[in-house]
Amino acid sequence: MANFPDKQYDSNNPYNIMITLSPFDVDRSTTIMMPKALLETNLFPFMEISTLVQLLQVQDKPKMIGVYDIDTQITTYVIIRQDGNNFKFHGWNDILKRKHYKAGDTIAFWWDLRHTRLNFKHVA
């Protein structure tokens, strides 16, 4: 099996998902929410079709995906589930234990096609 390099953060990537953390996202939260419209534009076009079908059509069966911290090189597996016009990523608290983010911090997320995971980095 080939060993591919991690897809690094590129501030010029138009498909970055920029999330400014709210107090809810950092105050003992187990989830982080992302708007469905943002994911439809910047994430879903790159995901495998079977994953999309499971996320969008089989809502009682959420999907587990890897979320990779590009700085620490740690992958955390989270459950992604649709909640109205948002998607919730359950398991976010495992990342918070290591990262100590504050409300107002901006996190960039981007899809890594070669590793089929969502990479992230604290950018502001």
UniProtKB/Swiss-Prot annotation:
**Major localization listed first in the record, in broad terms:** nucleus
Name the DNA-binding stretches.
32-124
Please name the SUPFAM superfamilies in this protein's record: DNA-binding pseudobarrel domain
Named from the GO MF annotations, one term is: DNA binding
Give the matching Gene3D superfamilies: DNA-binding pseudobarrel domain
Q: Which InterPro entries match?
A: B3_domain, DNA-bd_pseudobarrel_sf
- Location within or outside the cell: Nucleus
Give the highest taxon in the source lineage.
Answer: Eukaryota
- Give the protein's recorded name: B3 domain-containing protein At4g05630
What organism is the protein native to? Arabidopsis thaliana (Mouse-ear cress)
